UniProtKB/Swiss-Prot annotation:
It catalyses: dCTP + H2O + H(+) = dUTP + NH4(+). The gene is dcd. Transmembrane segments: none annotated. PANTHER family: DCTP DEAMINASE. The active site is at 138 (proton donor/acceptor). The keyword Hydrolase applies. This is dCTP deaminase. It comes from Haemophilus influenzae (strain PittGG).
């Protein structure tokens, strides 16, 4: 069952779901709560690698990823990050999210931004039960013009569903949880996948 605005408010008030900093109640709409853009970004550097072999030896995949991904870029308050057409970038939500083992979250982009060509999450919009940390956004500009993205702007909305029971393996206790407690735009850790 997806939570309605009344339940989202109650779950936040009771500490069942946590968003830090907590958005004002006027950011809770029907069945979602707005989340804002943080100030941490990563982009792909100019590179000459013809491809990344995602199924290659872990050491090679790790080296290839390291060679193409930038260090963390922090955008100061009031300044903009420019996402150019055809470009992929990673960013974070301003809010850190904490979910219990019986609730799953979903991130959706804003229709108004999508109409300008901005994809807020390329494919990864599920927030696992037991998640704790900021949400990394996979931005892609499929439009024709550069887009100026500023920290604190509303970037998407979260919705929540109560599971049929408590997850046996919530994200918070999984030993293979690669992005546990992330607070910045963490690059892909596909090289840490188990065989």
């Amino acid at each position: 069952m997806r939570l309605c605005d009344t339940d989202i408010e109650r779950y936040l008030d009771d500490g069942i779901i946590s968003l830090t900093p907590r958005p004002n109640n006027d950011k809770i709409n029907g069945a979602t709560i707005d989340v804002r853009l943080g100030n941490s970004f990563r982009v792909f550097r100019e590179h000459s690698a013809p491809f990344i072999d995602l199924s290659g030896p872990k050491e090679e995949v790790s080296a290839q990823l390291e060679s193409v991904m930038s260090d963390e870029i922090i955008i100061p308050e009031g300044e903009a990050f420019f996402l150019h057409p055809g470009t992929l970038a990673l960013a974070t939500t301003l809010e850190s999210v904490k979910l219990p083992a019986n609730i799953i979250g979903w991130l959706d982009g804003r229709s108004s931004l999508a109409r300008l060509g901005l994809m807020v999450h390329v494919t990864a919009h599920r927030i696992d039960p037991g998640w704790e940390g900021k949400i990394v956004l996979e931005f892609y500009n499929s439009g024709k013009l550069p887009l100026a993205l500023r920290p604190n702007m509303v970037i998407g909305a979260l919705s929540f569903e109560v599971l049929s029971g408590e997850a046996k393996r919530p994200y918070s206790i999984r030993k293979d949880a690669k992005y546990k407690n992330q607070q910045s735009a963490v690059a892909s850790r596909i090289d840490e996948d188990k065989e």
